[in-house]
Amino acid sequence: MIIDTTEVQAINSFSRSESLKEVYDLLWLLVPIFTPVLGITIGVLVIVWLEREISAGIQQRIGPEYAGPLGILQALADGTKLLFKEDLLPSRGDIRLFSIGPSIAVISILLSYSVIPFGYRLVLADLGIGVFLWIAISSIAPIGLLMSGYGSNNKYSFSGGLRAAAQSISYEIPLTPCVLSISLLSNSSSTVDIVEAQSKYGFWGWNLWRQPIGFIVFLISSLAECERLPFDLPEAEEELVAGYQTEYSGIKFGLFYVASYLNLLVSSLFVTVLYLGGWNLPIPYIFIPEPFGINKTDGVFGTTIDILITLAKSYLFLFVPIITRWTLPRMRMDQLLNLGWKFLLPISLGNLLLITSFQLVSL
């Protein structure tokens, strides 16, 4: 059987085109997955660098300066060092719980990014229950911390895990009515709809002015959820050595710090989305001159502007928890629980009742 050379070339060309098509399909499948991961990683590195520089300025000392320009790669160098350190395991601990705990803490926080809109319809999952899905997912992280403390077979670690669980429960409850109040004002639980509801009146339409009490309660509760000073009781050095992190080393030890900064960035982004207008500018788009083109919500330029506005608001807000860490002393455990249960919870419930009454009257 004689095969024409032209037919062989056509078959080879078809095979190459099919192979290229499969490669392109694989790339288009991986790009949406790795792009958010890369962006989140860079965001965490920037937060670590900002905190080190600000703390150095407050303490009148020189911050990181050798790893990269202005020391911006210091966090990456520290992470690489932890990656190659020995992973020690407690001899009498529960190895499975000890190993799974850090992963649960990080993964549960990473899932929260799926409902955060960085721009107009630029969100991984635009769900009708977006904000409440975030609350449900964030409740999983303390389970990982409790597993880490219990699996370490160490009294300091276990005490730190119990404190983390108690603190999360105490401040998750007052945080939920604040989110519910925002949902009532916006007539939706979707994060995209909440931002759109704030865009009607520009700067004065932000929920920051319509819900000042809820904003303060949300701010305090989110700081406690992130276990930042003055709420870092689960890992208080003077009392618990390092809390649930005491027995950890290597990359597992680093995962706890990754989870902490991821949670801080999530909280800042949700403050931006719920109270600071999301990707909207402080003034309505109609007042911006047409040559700037910012009033165009579609296209690459409009999407880039939306992302930059969201990130700018979030990183400006990050100065609050960073400065708070180096300003206020640590609270006692009884003060922490009293603040959550006896002060913030009644205020948030009263605020929710007030908003519900206004909404019923306006019907």
UniProtKB/Swiss-Prot annotation:
The keyword Lyase does not apply. It comes from the Eukaryota. It is an enzyme of class 7 (translocase). GO terms for cellular component: chloroplast thylakoid membrane. Its EC number is 7.1.1.-. The keyword Thylakoid applies. It is a multi-pass membrane protein. Belongs to the complex I subunit 1 family. PANTHER family: NADH DEHYDROGENASE SUBUNIT 1 (PTHR11432), NADH-UBIQUINONE OXIDOREDUCTASE CHAIN 1 (PTHR11432:SF3). NDH shuttles electrons from NAD(P)H:plastoquinone, via FMN and iron-sulfur (Fe-S) centers, to quinones in the photosynthetic chain and possibly in a chloroplast respiratory chain. The immediate electron acceptor for the enzyme in this species is believed to be plastoquinone. Couples the redox reaction to proton translocation, and thus conserves the redox energy in a proton gradient. This is NAD(P)H-quinone oxidoreductase subunit 1, chloroplastic.
